[in-house]
Amino acid sequence: MAKFSNWRELKQLLFFSFPIIVSQIARTAMSFVDIVMSGHYATADLAAVTLGSSIWFPIFVLGYGTIIMLAADVAKQKAQHDDEGIKDSLKNYLFLAVILSIPIIILLMLVSWLLSFIGIDEHILEITQGYVIALACGVPSVMIFNVFRSFLQGLEDTKIAMYLSAGALLLNIPLNYILIYGKLGLPEMGGIGAGITTAIINNLIAVCLIIYFLLKKEYRRYRPDFSLPKYNSLIRTFYIGMPSGLALFVEMVFLDVIAITAAPLGAQVIAAHNIMLNITSIIYTITGGIAAAVTVRVGSYIGKRDKISLTGTIKISIALILSISAVIGVLIYYFAGSFISLYTNDNGVIIIALNIIFLLCLFQFFDSCQAALSGILRGFHDTRSVFYAPLFGYWLVGLPLGFILALTDWVTERMGIIGFWYGLVLGLFVNAILLFIILKVRQRGMISRLISY
């Protein structure tokens, strides 16, 4: 076994993370392009696509978060040279992806239907429902794509997903233009056209990734047969993956509830709040991408029973993610005006956003911290802690505190949106502390098992 080198591990982690980060940026940018191009078409379509996206993401991540655990399984099994285990894991997650697609589609349809009862403008409602239905048509394919992406991630083969995601972004722009504005003899579809474009692209990249898997000779031994998965194995897969999906769902819904609760504070306040959240989501594509790579590295070292490398990669990954987050935070703080002006020229919105900027820097630092810790714990297959910690931090600490500070005078004068951001920051801080404590306990237990092997 080669001697562990901090510098070599850092280089490998960065090299491995880069394609994952690019993939995540490309997928995030697709949603941004949908919103921008719909906004240029009509204000109603902008509102509808924004609303539709806020419905889509929380429901989708419930399934997505469940199947990304395949990467940790494959990394561990590859390290143990367990080809049959890898084949079975791929079969289980593919089967699970298809099964989960059904409730995801039903939930999307149900929520879009429930919008009819909350007094939304009829025209906006029609576009929103059409956009969500279009996205729902691509759910099975995007789930299958993410299964194969996670599978390849576990094998540390990440470039093909990066190329496909980048290609999807490039294809998204002309297809959106054709379908939104009704070119090449097609009718104008507005925001609904953006949803149809996304569904088409999701189907296309899923087919491309399946073809890549089937054509690559090294992966022939991993091809699953067409028999049904073993019941006990499938249930185990579900119980490992589902808490991971619930953790992402809890976070997304938490942010949505904050946005809804803050809505009475006015349009400028909500605009500033959404700009801040958008900035944090862009930052997360970087730190979250590294965290996804860390999950694989940790799973691999556990499979090799290499306690020295396991300890080393945990320390390096946390230091790397927090260092990057700190640098980004400093840049955002000192160039806040420039960043915010990219989103708006409304002076009222800019002033409100500038008042939030320090809290945003703290938010993204603690968010990066919890991303790193969650990534490591996923590598340990401890997904329950990844779920329970944010459930406590966000819902039992962050949300109540934010509500009290923002909308009541129980502690101090009403702080408005800044009060909600104090709640966001404290919720993430508590989540990060809990995850750190859990990690230290899990790490000691894992090291003890590796030593006793």
UniProtKB/Swiss-Prot annotation:
GO terms for biological process: monoatomic ion transport. CDD domains: MATE_NorM_like. One of its GO terms (cellular component) is plasma membrane. GO terms for molecular function: antiporter activity; xenobiotic transmembrane transporter activity. It is a multi-pass membrane protein. Keywords: Antiport, Cell inner membrane, Cell membrane, Ion transport, Membrane, Transmembrane, Transmembrane helix, Transport. It is found in: Cell inner membrane. InterPro entries: MATE_fam, MATE_MdtK, MdtK-like. It comes from the Bacteria. Its main location: membrane. Belongs to the multi antimicrobial extrusion (MATE) (TC 2.A.66.1) family. Multidrug efflux pump. This is Probable multidrug resistance protein NorM.
